Amino acid sequence: MADVMQTMRKQTVADDIPMLDILRNEAKQRGVNFSNLHGMLKSDIKSGKTRIMRSGNTLLIYDILQPGVAELHIATMDSPEKLVVAVKDLFEAMKKAGYKKGVTVTDNSQIARVLNVANIPAAVQQILGKDGKAEYQLTIQVQ
């Protein structure tokens, strides 16, 4: 467990942006109300349903679906280069915590590219979103 915590703490202290600012930025980009997002996250974390890991200015928010499987969401204010490093760190922490698979749906086609650059195996399937726009369903192998 100490290894997981050590990996999660890996970040450049001088460049740290407060977690709430990262979440505020994510809410703004997605067009959702920050107070609602923050309240939902607080409730889900308190219930044990949701957890957050951080590396640099990237947050990995994940819901535990079943043992070893999590639904993943990334919120970041890192540059693309730092995002690749953060994603590597976060998936290494998930691996050490015993996760084998992560799943997510995103409208950002660049996430698959980031995973590829970070050497994290992912199956990508393009699907039609609720608004008729393309979305990407990713199944990520953590181990």
Cite the ranges covered by each PLM segment.
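A short helix-loop-beta-strand connector motif used in the catalytic cores of GNAT acetyltransferases and
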Residues: 39-58
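Conserved acetyl-CoA-binding loop-helix of GNAT-fold acetyltransferases
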Residues: 79-95
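Conserved active-site alpha-helix within GNAT-family acetyltransferase domains
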Residues: 107-125
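Conserved catalytic-core motifs of GNAT/GCN5-like acyltransferases
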Residues: 121-139
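Conserved GNAT acetyl-CoA-binding A-motif
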Residues: 96-107
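Short amphipathic alpha-helix that is part of the acyltransferase structural core
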Residues: 1-36, 142
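Conserved acetyl-CoA binding element of GNAT-fold acetyltransferases
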Residues: 65-78
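Active-site beta-strand termini and strand-to-loop segments that position acidic
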Residues: 54-56, 64, 140-143
